[in-house]
């Protein structure tokens, strides 16, 4: 969001995290008379933390009551399909309630269509009209649209993706515990783990053909974000990391 904001010539305000997650109270207090957009990723990237529905609903109500339609809240739900069913909620009902809310979803994660660059947004007509004025005219090609429609109807694949991710997450977290590494419990398809010399570990992993994401740019120089893969991919990462750390 910071880069997107800067690219538009706007001024960004980064609100410090609380326990690696969103501090909604602090985010509300950070709103100024010049504020126009507030971004919330839920589950969050790169930490994987999650804000429960009740807290999000209270934040939306508070922002709308104080600022009306002047401040738009963007709720980025890119990783929502990885949530346990008991934690999921229907954010579309909030769109009906709040004219200042945009909910964004992507098919790049759980649906496996990252190469097609396709997703969608939910909002009331006032905001969708503004978005349609500035979006590129051919931003999603016909093949991507057809694939997206098919993917949205494939509940079986989505369930398998959820189950594979859940099992892989457990494997990674157990490995981190055996290695004595601190990690952040994740609600997404990745786990944030503290390895100390993250730059050095990342380079060593790359030499073994294992790609993870350094997050020093997010203020976490000792941490790596590790995406959850297939069982054999997870084991390859664990073996490489264990060798590098000498454990």
Regions found by a protein language model. Give the residues of each.
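PLP-dependent enzyme catalytic core of the Aspartate aminotransferase-like
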Residues: 54, 58, 207-208, 212-213, ...
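Active-site pre-lysine segment of PLP-dependent enzymes
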Residues: 6, 22-34, 46-73, 77-110, ...
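Short beta-strands and strand-loop turn motifs
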Residues: 13-15, 37-44, 72-77, 184-186
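Short beta->alpha connector loops at strand-helix junctions that form conserved
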Residues: 14-19, 215-216
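Conserved PLP-binding catalytic core of the aspartate aminotransferase-like
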Residues: 17, 166, 174-208, 224
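Substrate-binding/gating loop at the entrance of the active-site cleft, primarily
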Residues: 1-10, 138
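PLP-dependent aminotransferase class I/II
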Residues: 100-184
